Structure formats: structure tokens, C-alpha cells
């Protein structure tokens, strides 16, 4: 469990997977160490697994929204000196990147493929129906993943909803301030 693995920390190095990090540097997409859970410790397996599965994408959405608010505050109230325009632009671009990447992560993790939160969410919400089709999903998951990566599917399944969330968070942050 995360406690025994030393993962109950905000230190990012405890969560870095070296191969995933190298892939980020090489191809722009990578991964962190997966968070292991012990379903045997759950009091209500479906309900508690659902909570765990929703927590990741929800955290991504909260981070995206807070970064959008931060961006608007910095921009609207001129919290960064206009004399250092390049520094201001860099900070705003980083903040917008945080909004974008967290929207993409939330949407991606909601895809119902084994290993992603969307798979667990569907399994927990519709256990009897899901078990009827899960064998097929497991059998063809590699083919589905390859098709997802090498075709424009990713752009539509992840890109379009991510872009909509990004714009929504920026619009809401703009309307607040």
C-alpha cells in the first residue's frame, strides 16, 4: 500500500517512474508509479473502489481549475511586474499548461480501459453488466490501445473534451474575477 511504499508524501520524487520520466523527455508522454491499493481493506468494495477511482480524475480537475484561477488573478491584477514581461509570460504559460495537462489527464483516466480509472468506475457502477463484457475488453485491450494511439481517436476522445474543459475553467475563472 502507499503507506508502506513511502508514497504518502507530496515529494514528487517518491512518485517518479524512471522509465515513464524518460519517455516524457523523449516522446512527450510518460507515466508515474501506479498507486497500489488493497481492496481487501475496503468495508464496501464497490463503493470504496468507486471513491478511489473518482479521486484521481477529480484531483486533476481541481488542480486545473485552481491553475485557471491563478492565471486569471495574475493576469487581471498584474501581480507580476510588467517590467519583467518575459517572466510574467513564462509564469502564465506554465499555469495554462498546468490547466491543459490536468484536463487531459482527467479525460484520459476516464477512458474505460483496464488499468485506467474509467474501467473501475464502470465496473463499480454496473457490476453485472460489466462482467458480461469485461472478458472481451481484456482480450482486445492491446488492439484498442494501439488503435487509440495510431489513429485520430485520441484527438477526439481526449483532445476535444480536454479543450472544452480547459475553456470552461478559464471562462469560469474570468467570470469570477
Which role fits each region the language model picked out?
Residues 1-177:
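Hydrophobic transmembrane alpha-helices and their immediate loop junctions
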Amino acid at each position: 500500500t502507499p503507506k508502506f511504499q513511502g508514497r504518502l508524501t507530496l515529494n514528487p520524487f517518491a512518485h517518479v517512474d524512471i522509465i515513464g520520466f524518460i519517455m516524457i523527455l523523449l516522446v512527450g508522454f510518460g507515466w508515474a508509479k501506479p498507486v497500489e491499493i488493497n481492496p481487501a481493506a475496503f468495508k464496501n468494495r464497490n463503493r470504496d473502489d468507486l471513491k478511489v477511482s473518482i479521486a484521481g480524475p477529480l484531483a486533476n480537475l481541481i488542480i486545473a481549475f485552481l491553475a485557471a484561477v491563478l492565471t486569471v488573478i495574475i493576469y487581471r491584477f498584474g501581480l507580476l511586474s510588467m517590467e519583467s514581461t518575459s517572466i510574467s509570460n513564462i509564469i502564465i504559460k506554465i499555469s495554462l499548461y498546468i490547466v491543459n495537462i490536468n484536463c487531459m489527464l482527467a479525460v484520459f483516466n476516464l477512458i474505460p480501459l483496464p488499468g485506467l480509472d474509467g474501467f473501475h468506475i464502470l465496473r463499480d457502477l454496473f457490476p453485472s453488466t460489466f462482467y458480461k463484457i469485461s472478458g472481451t475488453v481484456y482480450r482486445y485491450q492491446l488492439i484498442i490501445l494501439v488503435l487509440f494511439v495510431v489513429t485520430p481517436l485520441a484527438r477526439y476522445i481526449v483532445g476535444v473534451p480536454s479543450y472544452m474543459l480547459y475553456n470552461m475553467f478559464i471562462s469560469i475563472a474570468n467570470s469570477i474575477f
